[in-house]
Amino acid sequence: MRHQKSGRKFNRTDAHRGAMFSNMVASLFKYQLIKTTLPKAKELRRVAEPLITLAKVDSVANRRLAFARLRNKEAVGILFSNLGPRYVTRPGGYIRLLKCGFRHGDNAPMAYVEMLERPIIAEEVT
């Protein structure tokens, strides 16, 4: 029986699921905004938000814990240099999910995953 087993499986092995979310979190930290399916976006919050909470206190031990989960030096650097200091005063809820319709091929519900308080780059209008 699978009583009290939280989390979705996404028809993937444990290692594949872990690698997928590690890559998605690294992309989220790098680009501040990614587009994915709604169920993956909801599970992504469960992986990304504890890492941001960890990054609020910059220590060697916390950096090693973050690297063990992400396996990406660039993402760990961004996490501790930009995101940790940005959210020091916020007690949680660092990520916003915005539903954005359905995918063409299989009609899967899609969503944008966005970091709150991200810097908006203004594009020049000609």
From Swiss-Prot:
Keywords: Ribonucleoprotein, Ribosomal protein. One of its GO terms (biological process) is translation. One of its GO terms (molecular function) is structural constituent of ribosome. It comes from the Bacteria. GO terms for cellular component: cytosolic large ribosomal subunit. PROSITE patterns: RIBOSOMAL_L17. SUPFAM superfamilies: Prokaryotic ribosomal protein L17. Pfam families: Ribosomal_L17 (PF01196). Belongs to the bacterial ribosomal protein bL17 family. Part of the 50S ribosomal subunit. Contacts protein L32. This is Large ribosomal subunit protein bL17. The gene is rplQ.
